[in-house]
Amino acid sequence: MQKVKLPLTLDPVRTAQKRLDYQGIYTPDQVERVAESVVSVDSDVECSMSFAIDNQRLAVLTGDAVVTVSLECQRCGKPFTHQVHTTYCFSPVRSDEQAEALPEAYEPIEVNEFGEIDLLATVEDEIILALPVVPVHDSEHCEVSEADMVFGELPDEAQKPNPFAVLASLKRK
């Protein structure tokens, strides 16, 4: 299958009325905000999107995105590869009142003054939200052993004298 670049912006209502489906990619160069959140973006962002009108006559965008990124393990500090897969379901709105009236199944997405949505920013947002809060290797792949991880009371050799103890004695005088 040929890799097709997706549009950056589009009119979601017109697209939903035509019931269009998109399958394509965003290149690593295009997803700058994702690149700022990870060590590196290792693959194209592969997206599939479907636009439709639901039973309540709302325009709906459903889809998913998959990308492979490198993250820094927070235990050992080494980079590791992680595949991010996210799904989404949006409905375009023009105001907060419309957003409040949406069914819970739909996330609101604001349209600009031309009635278009920023598709790239939407996909980037979903990928960033799907990234792990604390990225770590699986325990068997991490170079930090279970013995090196200390929980609760610190061993005696790890407890150092408080450097501010001198200040406490001066305060008493």
Curated annotation (Swiss-Prot):
Induction of synthesis: Part of the yceD-rpmF operon, which may continue into downstream genes.
Alphabetical list of Pfam families matching this protein: YceD (PF02620)
CC terms in the record's Gene Ontology section: cytosol
One GO biological process term: ribosome biogenesis
Keywords: Ribosome biogenesis
Keyword hit for Protein transport: no
Role of this protein: Plays a role in synthesis, processing and/or stability of 23S rRNA.
Stored PANTHER family: LARGE RIBOSOMAL RNA SUBUNIT ACCUMULATION PROTEIN YCED
NCBIfam families in the record: PRK11193.1
Family under the similarity heading: Belongs to the DUF177 domain family.
The protein's name: Large ribosomal RNA subunit accumulation protein YceD
Organism: Salmonella typhimurium (strain LT2 / SGSC1412 / ATCC 700720)
Gene (name only): yceD
